[in-house]
Amino acid sequence: MARTKPTPPPLPHALIPLPAHTLPILRTGPQAVAYHIPTSPSSPSNPILKTTIALPLHSTWTSGLHFHTRHTEYLRLVQGAVHVHLDGEDKILSASTGGEIDLRTGALKAEGLVVKVPAYARHEWRRAEAWYAGRRSVGAKMTRPEDVGDEVVVEEYTDPSDLEKPLFFWNLNGIITATEDGELSVLQRVVRFVLGGWWIPFQLLVVFWELDNWPVFWDLRGIMRQFLGLKPWVYRHFGWRLEYAMTFVVLFAAKILGWWTGVRAVEQRRTPDKLWEAYKRHGI
């Protein structure tokens, strides 16, 4: 019996040329990703702050299921093919095809490579390749787009176009990629010891609360439909309220603990100078 070749590891790299007014952060591993994050506030020459995310072949990175309360978000596909889950609906967008494709035939279903995500809409996106891999056992025949194996490049931006998105990505990645903690107070060292492996997730929750990124911890829409067999109206009337309540309670608890211990969502050591100066002057 022939052996299946192991899947090569995804290799992230910075885009060449770099998107204007950005610097890259690379994260390796199975969820390899390259973030190109704005380093300065908006200006007449750069009115919309765009974070460009590149996902190499075989990356299993996902944005995670989440929502925003203060912003409308836009996802613009530049290259490759992505799966977008938006308020219970699954979409595959292909840059080479020019828009959303039919999941069964692969034909163009709707032109356009920009996905609008309204405030409070639950959404998640990833490489289409990763989504198809998870659907193999379902049995439904699906036609994949030609560019499913290409590197994925997506621009994220918001309306209003303020500092929150770049501050979020700089501080999120600053926490995740830090090789060691910055200078900690005695209280922070005690909390870090007590939390153990939850120290980093706790800091991320503080960032989520402050910078308008609300994770959905339990996908009750899927649980109610697939495992409990409940009708869709149950989620429409009750499920989403439970999801939002759980998210609020968890993040609020983290915010209170962060306030008590002095753990902040935005810190100077994780933030480029021009963004930090704008944040100190005007807030988010």
Language-model-detected regions and their locations in the chain:
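Jelly-roll (double-stranded beta-helix
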Residues: 2-72, 76-78, 83-284
